[in-house]
Amino acid sequence: MPDVISSLDSVTPELLTSIFRRNGLLGQGRILDVKFHPNPAFNSVAAHLEPVYSEDAPADVPERLFIKIKQNHWGRDEVAFYRLVTGQKPPPSMLIPLIDGAYDKETGVSHCLMLDVSGTHHAPVSRERILAGDGVPEEEELAGCVDALAGLHAYWWEHSALRDGPVRIPPPFRDEERYMTEVRCQTEEWRRFRKTAGGELPRELIKLYERRIEALPTLWDRYLKHRFDCFSQFTACHSDCYFTQFLCPDDPEVHGTYLSDMEEVCVCLGAEDLVYLIATFWTREQRQENDRETRCLTRYYESLVKRGVKNYSWDDLCGDYRLQLIWRVELPVWDQQNGSTRDYWRLKMQCLVDAYRDWDCATLL
């Protein structure tokens, strides 16, 4: 296992030269200097790097790199996943190639050193646009995001490397005991939410959440246990899959769409990511405009099938989407209890609740 890079000060020309040689990127020559361009990030130290090479370095060495360094074990699963990816042939094309990654379980520090694609790619929408209620990408970029997500899911669909590998099923779904522990946590979280913010919600919304909390204990046996026990129709999920996590190509004829920031990667139903992508910050009007939601789900499903996914019907997808809406409609409650602003969690709650109702999720309880 490579040594962990714990700070940007550690990123010296000598270190990068060693990393490049170890990974077969620099057969001759060396790195003479490194130019740093810091990149503000929520929970990591990140920077764009420009190596300066000696004249005898190969012509095809990477011109720009991106590094992120995380503390408190936040990067553990991301490093494990990317290292798993590097062993796959061919590697999944929607993931930015990793050059080097390491995690120290004693200190909780990790790093990922990757190719920098910021010169050829851009985010389809900004966080500011999403929070302003303008989170729908341009049609071509939306299609690219859906295709990239379907590609990720199809690649890892019931993949043998996920059964006993480093990417794991989320704790609440590993067994009944942990599921019921999560139910108790959500029940207590809802109780605190009602006390601090419930007064501003309409009665019918309170009833919707109360009914969900009451039904949660029954969902394990009815919908979840057999799926997780049999590893049925599972894949690698991003699990924080907002549009800000995608990077769309400036020139689609040359490059494809990437998914980034795999910090929350897990083994789950693919609909987990679809709910984040479609239902979390799109209003009812945005989902229904020109059947946008249905078109996205249809495109996703058809892409799965084209990529070889079998024994998964359209009805299966719709059922999973409804099930994940039931699970994720709790997100804004968690957000409010963990310090998110009112504007943030209220917008998310309205979007998720509208989708929950439109898909008649209460009938599954």
Regions found by a protein language model. Give the residues of each.
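Conserved NTP-binding catalytic cores of kinases and kinase-like/nucleotidyltransferase enzymes
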Residues: 1-110, 249-257
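Active-site acidic catalytic loop and adjacent metal/ATP-binding pocket
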Residues: 40-57, 217-270
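ATP-binding pocket architecture of kinase catalytic cores
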Residues: 60-80, 84-167
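Generic recognition of stable, solvent-exposed alpha-helical segments in well-folded globular domains
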Residues: 77, 140, 144-147, 236, ...
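Active-site activation/catalytic loop segments of kinase-like enzymes and analogous catalytic loops
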Residues: 80, 264-308, 325-344
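ATP-dependent phospho-/nucleotidyl transfer catalytic cores
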Residues: 125-151, 157-238, 249-252, 365
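Short helix/strand-bridging catalytic loops that position acidic/His residues to coordinate divalent metals
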Residues: 128-137, 259-264, 280-284
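Extended catalytic cores and adjacent scaffolds of nucleotide/polyanion-binding enzymes
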Residues: 307-318, 326-365
